[in-house]
UniProtKB/Swiss-Prot annotation:
Role of this protein: Multidrug efflux pump that acts independently of NorA and is one of the factors that confers resistance against diverse quinolones and chemical compounds.
Main localisation: membrane
Listed InterPro entries: MFS, MFS_dom, MFS_trans_sf
GO-annotated biological processes: response to antibiotic
The protein, known as: Quinolone resistance protein NorB
Family membership noted in the UniProt record: Belongs to the major facilitator superfamily. TCR/Tet family.
Record's keyword annotation contains Transmembrane: yes
Pfam families named in the record: MFS_1
Its membrane topology: Multi-pass membrane protein
Localization in the cell: Cell membrane
GO CC list: plasma membrane
Length: 463
């Protein structure tokens, strides 16, 4: 049977399932470690600092390299980059489970970050290339279920698997899912940009981006420990500022930049990407609220995770509803409604001064609104970003969009954790949690304002 060409191939359910399975290798499986930190400490006989590095480094490296991977997908092939990403996940998972050596755990998690960097922009580009109109919006809904839904389920999933089967089974299952994804994607004709010449890769831009983001991450996670007046803190801050400035200058002059700032001339794309960064940042809600109910109320990790079940159920249900709202009202209204509902949920979860029973009720309702809001927002936002990118730059555009997701989550968790720790030490746990959750609500409010100002009422999508 003759293999279909790029011109004749139409995206089908087989390919879509393969794409979704590849996406959840990061958002569901790799992110599940957030709920098994104490178990990893015992298994690897190491301290919590080392484990926290291993947990956070995946999202950080994904965010740092996702834009570059998007450019590579445009140039060398989106199917090829997706397959490379899946294989990297298998390799990273194997390194994590084969020994009790902390260094291999960190290296494995780093490789999983590179895997996610390859998979996310490449799969979005495949959807852009092979699905049209309502089929694309449906495909993006399922992609969003894999990403937003996976992130909602990961904490509960990780705890359940670790309790019932052992934590290594998280990555054994991830390897199995990866192999199935490779099989389902096999046979799909390659898609790449026809107009981009194979210029030299922007290594200088990538190096500066990595230096800048690593510096910022150190400042956020270790700033209070270092002291803001210490020479080391000031030095790292200077490195972050200088590398950021050099990066902007270099990228504007480069003929083949890592980040094409021309994409941000489109207000709809800018609004979707910036709001996506901020709403991924509210992932800090989970770590703050879970830590508070365990330390402040004496709940177990399973009990803490159970409070957020309404979140994961609602985000999975509402993603398809968000797709229908997109088709009916365009992108702006669902994005605004989703963000507003999320802010209400944040405010309810932040009421840590209430008596235990009332707070638990507020938490359950708050998580319900939290998931409802994210579910409504997800598909319209993703569709806005992808539809407003020119076809020859869709890989880079998708890469920037997903960089916003990964870095928003990484820095949101880091900031929330830092604020919680600092304020708790100065006052008490209740106040520390409340202020940290207000920070997350503030990010939601800022996201709402950005959508209101930048995303047009009737989006001129390039379908």
């Amino acid at each position: 049977m003759e293999k279909p060409s790029r011109e004749t191939f139409e995206g089908n359910n087989k390919l879509l399932i393969g794409i979704v399975l590849s996406v959840i290798t990061f958002w569901l499986f790799a992110q599940s470690l957030v709920n098994v930190v104490p178990i990893l400490e015992d298994s690897f006989n190491t301290d919590i600092g080392t484990v926290n590095i291993a947990v956070s480094i995946t999202a950080l490296f994904s965010g740092m390299f996702v834009v570059g991977a998007g450019g590579l997908a445009d140039k060398y092939g989106r199917i090829k980059l997706t397959n490379i990403g899946i294989i990297l996940n298998i390799l990273g998972s194997l390194l994590i489970i084969i020994s009790n050596i902390p260094l291999l755990l960190i290296i494995g998690r780093l490789i999983q970050g590179l895997s996610a960097a390859c998979i996310m922009p490449a799969t979005l580009s495949i959807i852009k290339s092979y699905y049209i109109g309502k089929d694309r919006q449906r495909a993006l809904s399922y992609w969003s279920i894999g990403s937003w839904g996976g992130s909602g389920v990961c904490s509960f999933f990780g705890g359940a698997v670790a309790t019932l089967l052992g934590w290594r089974w998280i990555f054994i299952l991830s390897i199995i899912i990866s192999l199935i994804a490779l099989f389902l994607i096999k046979g799909t004709p390659e898609t790449k940009s026809k107009s981009i010449s194979l210029n030299k890769f922007d290594i200088k831009g990538l190096v500066l981006l990595v230096i800048m983001l690593l510096s910022l991450n150190i400042l956020i996670t270790k700033g209070s420990e270092l002291g803001v007046t210490s020479l080391l803190f000031i030095t790292i801050l200077a490195i972050a500022i200088v590398s950021f400035s050099l990066f902007i200058v270099l990228e504007k002059r480069a003929t083949n930049p890592l980040i094409d700032f021309k994409l941000f001339k489109n207000k709809a794309y800018t609004g979707a990407t910036a709001s996506n960064f901020l709403l991924n940042g509210v992932a800090g809600t989970l770590i703050v609220a879970n830590t508070f109910v365990q330390r402040g109320l004496g709940y177990s990790s399973l009990q803490a995770g159970s409070l957020s079940i309404t979140y994961l159920v609602m985000v999975l249900i509402m993603i398809r509803v968000g797709e229908k709202l997109l088709q009916t009202f365009g992108c702006k209204k669902p994005m605004l409604i989703g963000t507003a509902v999320l802010i209400v949920g944040e405010c309810l979860i932040s009421l840590t001064f209430l008596p235990e029973i009332l707070y638990v009720i507020c938490c359950i309702i708050g998580y319900l609104f939290f998931g409802l809001g994210l579910g409504i927002y997800a598909t319209p936002s993703t569709d806005t970003a992808i539809a407003n990118a020119p076809l020859e730059k869709v890989g880079v555009a998708a890469g920037i969009y997903k960089m916003a997701s990964a870095l928003g989550g990484a820095f949101g968790v880091a900031l929330s954790g830092a604020v919680y720790a600092i304020v708790s030490n100065m006052t008490n746990i209740d106040t520390g949690a409340m202020i940290a959750l207000w920070l997350n609500a503030g990010m939601g409010i800022l996201s709402f304002v950005i959508i209101l100002l930048l995303v047009p009422k009737q989006n001129d999508t390039q379908l």
